[in-house]
Amino acid sequence: MKEMRNLTILLALLFSFFVVGNVDARHYKSKRKATTHRVVKKKKHVRKRRVIVRPPTIHENPYLQCEDTCSHVHGIDLSHYQGDVFWETVGENTRTAYVYLKATEGGDRIDDRYERNIDLAHRHGLKVGSYHFFRPRTDLTQQMKNFRAQCLPGEQDLIPMLDVESTGGLSNEEFCDSLSKFLLMMEEVYHQKPLIYTGRNFYNKHLLGMVDDYLLMIAMYTDEEPVLADERDICLWQYTGRGRINGVVGHVDKSRFMGQHGLRELRFRH
């Protein structure tokens, strides 16, 4: 009897251990599932930004030339700084319609490439004009003689141009007086008003109201067309001093007509 009671107690204990073990196992599995459950994050909707690609400008891309991007009439100006020019190659460029050549500077300086340049430029079909670099403090009569000896009317297709870039240390009143007298001398010698070349900033500072009767070539090396302080009309815009053209080694100054202006306005009247 005693043995039966002990066996019963032993079976009861084994049963209780079995039941508790199953409960703990189920609890462990449930807990494990809860802790290892994968959390899927909701994707955020990202709005795509539209990117507008702007074509490079001539000042950002050295291989892109202004004449490649517009329909204006273009030209160049040259001096001895460009060395030997291959004029046949330059003449084959159908987008280069004219060239201004440096002839003289001050009272006695002569560009040593001028004679060769003007001869070959004519031979290869370019419309040619000549320019003088003005020195306000130098004797005006001597400057005029120097320019006239080189810039022969019979060799000109375009009106002469005066390059004005410095006051020479004169007061603005003295400078403007010197310039006005020289412009009149050029007009008397060539029987037509010259073209004036200058920079936008120089014009705004020194020439406002002084050269209203003359056509202007304005130098400003930006992507925006120049606008003068008095908003006067501009005939030509020199838009770069670092242009390139087949036939010229290195950089070259390039210009183009503004608005409705054209070569007919610069034609030398013989």
Describe the residue ranges of each PLM region.
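Bacterial N-terminal signal peptides that target proteins for export
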Residues: 1-9
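Bacterial N-terminal signal peptides
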Residues: 10-18
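Sec/Tat signal peptide C-region and signal peptidase I cleavage site
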Residues: 20-25
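Boundary/entry segment of secreted carbohydrate-active catalytic domains
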Residues: 27-97, 102-104
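Functionally critical loop-and-helix segments that line ligand-binding/catalytic clefts
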Residues: 53-75, 211-270
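Substrate-binding cleft of extracellular glycoside hydrolase catalytic domains
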Residues: 62, 68-83, 91, 101-183, ...
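Flexible, glycine-rich phosphate/dinucleotide-binding loops
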Residues: 108, 137, 203, 225, ...
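Catalytic domains of cell-wall/extracellular-matrix polysaccharide-remodeling enzymes
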Residues: 158-231
